[in-house]
């Protein structure tokens, strides 16, 4: 019901049915992610952290490995000389005898089948010099190198000799033992060019022998070079390890260090009847070796290509 106003006039009627409603108040959206959204991203985040950690560790490991490898190659190219160890040191002799000397046979492999043995030309000559001596003693340095026959195999298998076979090259050493030289000993080593033991780098490409005084300039950086460490013992130390002081035949092939090896021998303490030395150097080097052996009471008797035969004067008949 409409009530009259003071002037008897009714006020205008207002209706709200067609007026628009005010918009509802809006809620402020939170800018931070919710816990549920974090749970959805957690596996991916964990993977990224783990991947980054693994890659960091891998890079550090690779850098350390490369550094260690380089240092190893540097050490492999460096000769170790045991200056304080005399060639007649009792501990050295015991070490050679108990650790390095072994029978010249390979029990786990079938012996190599070869024709002969037949004496080489220089061996046949030496047999005549020694009047077909039986049961002699030899030392052969460089036996079976590069597939060559041993100059002492005929002496051992046909004339009952025995002795020591020296071979520094690993492959040739194992082939040596397959020749079934049961009367002799073998050693995987080289003859030292100094009157004390040393450890050197053996370059597999040096097929003529161990280049003791030469280190290849590309040894550290050149991956085509395969190097191994080889121990070198003085000739006199090896004789003491075998309990001998007298040798009928010494065959010396050491790839360029023959003179230095001969200079380490105390000729006043050992007796070597015949020395067959390989000389592949120039004429001046040959003359130097000849003069040295002549000074040690040897006389030059005959040459066979690069092999030169010397004999101790007082042993000649």
Give short role names for the model-derived ranges.
Residues 2-317:
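Phosphate/nucleotide-binding beta-alpha loop and adjacent structural elements of enzyme active sites
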């Amino acid at each position: 019901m409409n009530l009259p106003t003071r002037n008897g006039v009714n006020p205008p009627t207002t209706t709200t049915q067609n007026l628009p409603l005010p918009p509802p108040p809006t809620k402020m959206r939170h800018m931070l992610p919710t816990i549920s959204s974090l749970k959805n991203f957690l596996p991916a985040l964990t993977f990224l952290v783990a991947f980054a950690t693994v890659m960091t560790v891998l890079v550090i490991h690779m850098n350390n490995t490369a550094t260690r490898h380089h240092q190893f190659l540097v050490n492999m190219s460096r000769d170790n000389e045991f200056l304080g160890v005399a060639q007649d040191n009792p501990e050295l002799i015991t070490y050679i005898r108990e650790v390095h000397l072994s029978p010249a046979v390979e029990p786990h492999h079938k012996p190599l089948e070869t024709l002969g043995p037949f004496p080489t030309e220089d061996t046949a000559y030496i047999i005549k010099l020694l009047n077909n001596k039986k049961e002699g003693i030899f030392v052969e340095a460089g036996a079976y190198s590069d597939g060559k026959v041993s100059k002492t195999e005929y002496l051992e298998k046909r004339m009952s000799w025995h002795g020591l076979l020296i071979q520094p090259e690993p492959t040739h050493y194992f082939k040596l033992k397959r020749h079934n030289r049961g009367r002799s000993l073998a050693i995987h080593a080289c003859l030292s060019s100094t009157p004390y033991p040393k450890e050197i780098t053996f370059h597999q490409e040096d097929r003529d022998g161990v280049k003791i005084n030469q280190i290849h300039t590309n040894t550290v950086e050149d991956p085509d070079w395969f190097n191994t460490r080889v121990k070198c013992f003085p000739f006199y130390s090896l004789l003491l390890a075998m309990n001998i002081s007298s040798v009928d035949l010494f065959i010396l092939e050491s790839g360029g260090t023959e003179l230095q090896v001969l200079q380490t021998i105390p000729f006043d303490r050992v007796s070597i009847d015949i020395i067959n030395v390989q000389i592949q150097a120039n004429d001046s080097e040959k003359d130097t070796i000849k003069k040295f052996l002549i000074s040690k009471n040897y006389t030059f008797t005959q040459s066979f290509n690069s092999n030169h035969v010397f004999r101790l004067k007082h042993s000649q008949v």
